[in-house]
Amino acid sequence: MNSAKLAKILEDHKLWVTSLHESGSRADLRDANLRDANLRGADLYGADLRDANLRDANLRDANLRGADLYGADLRGADLRGADLRDADLRGADLYGADLRGADLYGADLRGADLPDHTFVIMGEKYAITIENGEYVRAGCQSHSIEEWRKFSKQEIAKMDGRKALKFYPRLIDIIDFYTGKGERPDWLKSKEYADEVKEQ
């Protein structure tokens, strides 16, 4: 697809989103060849991207919330920081995609081919995504596994107060289960921490 046509579709889509569907038109990019496209930061909220070729596309920080990406080819795509909440990714090929910091909360991933060592864990206090076996997103916090294992009590408390402090051991258990047992900070074993958690 040529860049002028794509720019027009994105412009009409932005108007459609901001006018609450009163004007403009929803982006219809079904079967579109967007291989290597630079869509960094694009607002594709609710867009139709079924079966689109987005291989190696730059979708960093893109808004793909509620987008229909059924069967899309996203191999090697840069999806760092992308908002994929409630997106339809059924049957999508995400092999080799970079999902660091991407928000997949509520995304339908049935039949999707995810990058190696990528897991989406539902049913916890926070939505959790383990990305490429290296990064973990819990709620709105995304850090390397090594960083999660070394955070101080104060750093965890700054994330979401007592709720985060109470959940932190569970998060480390989840990381251990999916990526292998690793170190834990000493403060987790302290009597002070145990007493603080009991008070809640």
Regions picked out by a protein language model, each given a short descriptive name:
Residues 99, 104, 109-153:
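Glycine-rich hexapeptide-repeat left-handed beta-helix
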Residues 7-10, 126, 170:
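A generic structural signal for ordered alpha-helices
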Residues 1-85, 90, 95, 177-200:
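Extended, small-residue-rich solenoid/repeat segments and analogous flexible loops
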Residues 7-10, 39, 64, 89, ...:
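Generic detection of intrinsically disordered/low-complexity segments and helix-coil linkers/edges
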